[in-house]
Swiss-Prot record:
GO terms for molecular function: ribosome binding; rRNA binding; translation initiation factor activity. The keyword Lipid metabolism does not apply. Keywords: Cytoplasm, Initiation factor, Phosphoprotein, Protein biosynthesis, RNA-binding, rRNA-binding. Component of the 30S ribosomal translation pre-initiation complex which assembles on the 30S ribosome in the order IF-2 and IF-3, IF-1 and N-formylmethionyl-tRNA(fMet); mRNA recruitment can occur at any time during PIC assembly. It comes from the Bacteria. The keyword Protein biosynthesis applies. Its main location: cytoplasm. This is Translation initiation factor IF-1. One of its GO terms (cellular component) is cytosol. It is found in: Cytoplasm. SMART domains: S1. The modification Phosphotyrosine is found at residue 60.
Amino acid sequence: MAKDDVIEVEGTIVETLPNAMFKVELENGHTVLAHVSGKIRMHFIRILPGDKVTVELSPYDLTRGRITYRYK
């Protein structure tokens, strides 16, 4: 999948799940299941409920995504 095909949206972490998975509520009200990208994992950036994040969604499955950025 090319990088151009992803949909980037902003949301808020609602719940922390096992294996670095999170429930994220998007700005449009939808809830998606998202995992942490490799760069965030590599730099030990902690993500807690209530944090504002950027999520990449695949056009093929809009219920799952990848967290690519945590706002300060």
